[in-house]
């Protein structure tokens, strides 16, 4: 889903070739059916890069990642206030749900809990 540069897509700034580390996030975006476009950068600050990516995306959502952190930003938020921040050491379900939530921001539907499993069933605790 990341090959067509003319279709509206979530812009993802990949800093220092780290996209392989965040595969679950990309799969979460794909699960929701929203296209994304990878933009490789040799260096940069993650929060600012995510905000710049959101500004460049017609979908108003941008993501940036380095080897330690991934940030989801929305164009209408202040540059210093990203919507979601994910650390690499968090579990794969949090990674997948962050991708789902970036796509859900585009769709305008409720977010998933970052730590819940996406089974489609509600659990009472």
Swiss-Prot record:
Signal sequence, renumbered to the chain: none
Binding site for Mg(2+): 31
Catalytic reaction list: ATP + H2O = ADP + phosphate + H(+)
Gene3D superfamilies: B12-dependent dehydatase associated subunit (3.40.50.10150)
An annotated Gene Ontology molecular function: metal ion binding
Subunit structure: Component of the DDR complex, a heterotetramer of DdrA(2)/DdrB(2). The DDR complex interacts with the diol dehydratase complex in the presence of ADP but not ATP.
Family label: Belongs to the DdrB/PduH family.
Designated name of the protein: Diol dehydratase-reactivating factor small subunit
Organism name: Klebsiella michiganensis (strain ATCC 8724 / DSM 4798 / JCM 20051 / NBRC 3318 / NRRL B-199 / KCTC 1686 / BUCSAV 143 / CCM 1901)
Top-level taxonomy: Bacteria, Pseudomonadati, Pseudomonadota, Gammaproteobacteria, Enterobacterales
This protein's encoding gene: ddrB
């Amino acid at each position: 889903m990341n090959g067509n540069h003319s279709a509206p897509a979530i812009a993802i700034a990949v800093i220092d070739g780290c996209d392989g580390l965040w595969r679950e996030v990309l799969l979460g975006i794909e699960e929701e059916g929203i296209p994304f476009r990878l933009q490789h950068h040799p260096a940069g600050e993650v929060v600012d890069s995510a905000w710049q990516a959101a500004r460049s995306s017609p979908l108003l959502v941008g993501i940036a990642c380095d080897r330690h952190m991934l940030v989801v930003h929305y164009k209408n938020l202040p540059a210093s206030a990203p919507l979601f921040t994910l650390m690499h050491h968090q579990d794969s379900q949090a990674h997948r749900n962050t991708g789902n939530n970036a796509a859900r921001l585009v769709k305008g539907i409720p977010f998933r809990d970052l730590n819940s499993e996406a089974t489609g069933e509600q659990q009472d605790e």
